[in-house]
């Protein structure tokens, strides 16, 4: 007997992950209505999935949506192997701007250079004495500026470091041109803001890129009011092709009204606003991550704590009582310990509070995540990017604290997986590969870096599907191919459970489907 639904879409010619006897899915109004055999299902519209393997739509649990869009329109300095080559690239691009206009770039990483020391303002002054230059580091926690930018911001020898930030200085106390964490704002406040139209264009570019990678859902780590308004407008215009779980930025102008009104839910599942993002420390690459012991390569430095602890405790209580989850950025082991202390003191377990990154965790704190009910949101690709230089930052004795995925899972917690894009590539297949191998794309090191912490393929898939759904309170709506669930699918050319590890990277995205609509086809 054949089953049909009006105004429905039938997806056929596929293998469905976890449902071996089915080869078709019928969807209507954005949800899954029937899973079965194509010979028994009739739809108003039929889409041939070309023999692909259908997975629950992949979710990235931590990225920066507008940041991705900005990166697509800004000079990229990623994977450049020396400051001299960066200067060459800047010189070519400077020809396209007017003298005195702000020049921006992003993505430099001194860890990729032979001399891994920080660059200086003089390098930029030599090619641009009159146009201010602002170059954001790959992690977004440091910036490299020239003297003109420092002059505009009135940063001199006498300028004190702001709370939660650092102005790097030479032996005479003069700023070198490197600003860490909150010190970046001293210059950034003078850069012209993007218009709403600019932001809309950038968001759409970001969504298009994410769709092409098989991503159907994202957790946006730091969303301001204007971006939320843009997203709502895109929903009403039926232009938003991705589902978004928005983390409010830590600014009272952004969150005050939400504290009064409570969380926001779009009834189509495109937008949820029910968490706030806090930054407790900086990043490891720029030595702002807060450590329990000094940096191995900078013994005077233990990193930065960016928040007042008591005020943060009060804020967690306030947000949890209003029904909002709290997501705290913690990279270093000191930050993770303090973050856990804060959430243990002030958090409500039912709010599923999160720690974003959880990259370096003291062994004594591993079990606390499960005990307190805090969800670690981690990015597998950070492990394989950082492993080549992290020994310089931490020394050999602390490497057992880094990216302890399997140790965390064994205590009973889940891990929400993501990329931190544009810091890393948003490609979830690169993330799955990193999670199951702990190797770089060249296949090094043999056995994987700290290979005992590798994930199984099943765990890696959960990290991009069911676990993010739970981390966003949506485990009964998305993250599975199940009747009544949101019709979000990622269709791949290969079966991730059976291909060789290196072939995960060769797997193609054939289709991306959001709310039953094909938003990307190869």
What are these model-predicted stretches?
Residues 7, 23, 477-480, 509:
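Short, conserved secondary-structure segments in the cores of folded domains
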Residues 34-35, 105, 489-492, 521:
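A generic structural signal for residues embedded in beta-strands
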Residues 61, 372, 487:
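An anion/phosphate-binding loop that grips the pyrophosphate of nucleotide cofactors and donors
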Residues 234-238, 262-268, 348, 369-373:
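Acidic (Asp/Glu)-rich catalytic clusters
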Residues 93, 501-522:
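P-loop/Walker A phosphate-binding loop and immediately adjacent motor/lid segment at beta-alpha junctions
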Residues 64, 270-288, 372-384:
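Non-cysteine beta-strand/loop elements that form the S-adenosyl-L-methionine
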Residues 317-327, 331-353, 357-358, 363-367, ...:
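His/Asp/Glu-enriched, well-ordered alpha-helical/loop segment
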Residues 4-28, 32-259, 278, 283-335, ...:
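Divalent metal-binding segments
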């Amino acid at each position: 007997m054949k089953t049909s639904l009006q105004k429905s879409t039938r997806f056929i010619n596929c293998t469905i992950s976890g449902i071996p006897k089915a080869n078709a899915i019928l969807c209507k109004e954005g949800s899954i209505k029937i899973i079965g055999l194509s010979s028994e299902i009739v739809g108003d519209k039929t889409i041939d999935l070309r023999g692909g393997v259908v997975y629950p739509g992949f979710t990235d649990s931590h990225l920066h949506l507008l940041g991705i869009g900005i990166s697509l329109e800004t000079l990229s300095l990623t994977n450049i192997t020396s400051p001299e080559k960066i200067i060459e690239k800047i010189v070519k691009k400077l020809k396209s701007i007017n003298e005195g206009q702000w020049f921006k770039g992003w993505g430099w990483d001194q860890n990729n250079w032979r001399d891994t020391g920080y660059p200086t303002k003089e390098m930029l002054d030599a090619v641009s004495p009159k146009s201010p230059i602002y170059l954001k580091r790959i992690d977004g926690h440091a910036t490299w500026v020239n003297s003109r930018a420092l002059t505009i911001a009135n940063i001199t020898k006498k300028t004190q470091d702001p709370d939660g930030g650092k102005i790097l200085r030479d032996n005479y106390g003069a700023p070198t041109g490197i600003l860490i964490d909150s010190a970046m704002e001293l210059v950034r406040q003078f850069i012209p803001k993007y218009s709403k139209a600019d932001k809309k264009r950038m968001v759409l570019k970001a969504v298009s890129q994410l769709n092409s990678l098989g991503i159907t859902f994202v957790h946006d780590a730091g969303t301001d009011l204007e971006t939320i308004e843009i997203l709502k407008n895109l929903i009403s215009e039926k232009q938003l092709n991705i589902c978004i779980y928005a983390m409010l930025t830590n600014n009272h102008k952004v969150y005050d009204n939400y504290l009064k009104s409570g969380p926001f839910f779009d009834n189509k599942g495109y937008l949820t606003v029910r968490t706030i993002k806090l930054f407790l420390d900086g990043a490891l690459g720029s030595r702002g991550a807060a450590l329990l012991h000094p940096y191995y390569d900078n013994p005077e430095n233990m990193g930065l704590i960016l928040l007042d602890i008591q005020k943060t405790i009060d804020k967690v209580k306030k947000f949890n009582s209003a029904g909002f989850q709290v997501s705290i950025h913690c990279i270093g082991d000191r930050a993770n310990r303090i973050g856990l202390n804060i959430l243990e003191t002030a958090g409500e377990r039912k709010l599923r509070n999160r720690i974003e990154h959880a990259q370096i965790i003291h062994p004594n704190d591993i079990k606390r995540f499960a005990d307190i009910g805090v969800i670690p949101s981690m990015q597998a690709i950070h492990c394989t990017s950082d492993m080549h230089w992290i020994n310089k930052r931490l020394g050999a004795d602390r490497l057992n604290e880094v990216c302890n995925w399997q140790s965390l899972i064994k205590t009973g917690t889940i891990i929400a997986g993501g990329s931190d894009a544009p810091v890393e590539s948003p490609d979830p297949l690169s993330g799955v590969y990193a999670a199951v191998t702990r190797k770089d794309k060249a296949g090094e090191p043999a056995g994987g870096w700290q290979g005992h912490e590798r994930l199984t393929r099943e765990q890696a898939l959960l990290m991009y599907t069911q676990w993010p759904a739970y981390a966003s309170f949506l485990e009964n709506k998305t993250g599975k191919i199940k009747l009544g669930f949101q019709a979000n699918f990622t269709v791949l050319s290969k079966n991730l459970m059976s291909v060789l590890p290196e072939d995960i990277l060769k797997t193609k995205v054939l289709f991306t489907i959001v709310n039953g609509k094909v938003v990307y086809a190869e």
